From Swiss-Prot:
The gene is rps19. GO terms for cellular component: chloroplast; mitochondrial small ribosomal subunit. This is Small ribosomal subunit protein uS19c. It is found in: Plastid, Chloroplast. Its main location: plastid. Protein S19 forms a complex with S13 that binds strongly to the 16S ribosomal RNA. Belongs to the universal ribosomal protein uS19 family. InterPro entries: Ribosomal_uS19 (IPR002222), Ribosomal_uS19_bac-type (IPR005732), Ribosomal_uS19_CS (IPR020934), Ribosomal_uS19_SF (IPR023575).
Length: 92
């Protein structure tokens, strides 16, 4: 179910504060966050945000096509290694 339009998109307050501070200084640095549920808003464009995937922080450069998506969509948590090969010896 999508979020109601009368509600604003969720962005963690600490993340929003860091981005606003960097925008006023016109600086670029990597912002580390654990907030995967935060929505990408236009003020984040051009920043690099390191999103936690459960094990490490993955740096993601934010572009205009990402606006409206959640940060967690760009940091996969599971690495699929493929199905087990057909080994007849292990079945016996």
């Amino acid at each position: 179910m999508t979020r109601s339009l009368k509600k604003n998109p969720f962005v963690a307050k600490h993340l929003l504060r860091k981005i606003e501070k960097l925008n006023t200084k016109a600086e670029k640095e990597i912002i580390i966050t654990w907030s995967r549920a935060s929505t990408i808003i236009p003020t984040m464009i051009g920043h690099t945000i390191a999103i936690h995937n459960g094990r490490e922080h993955l740096p993601i450069y934010i572009i205009d096509l990402m606006v409206g998506h959640k940060l967690g969509e760009f940091a996969p948590t599971i690495n699929f290694r493929g199905h087990a090969k057909n080994d007849n010896r292990s079945r016996r």
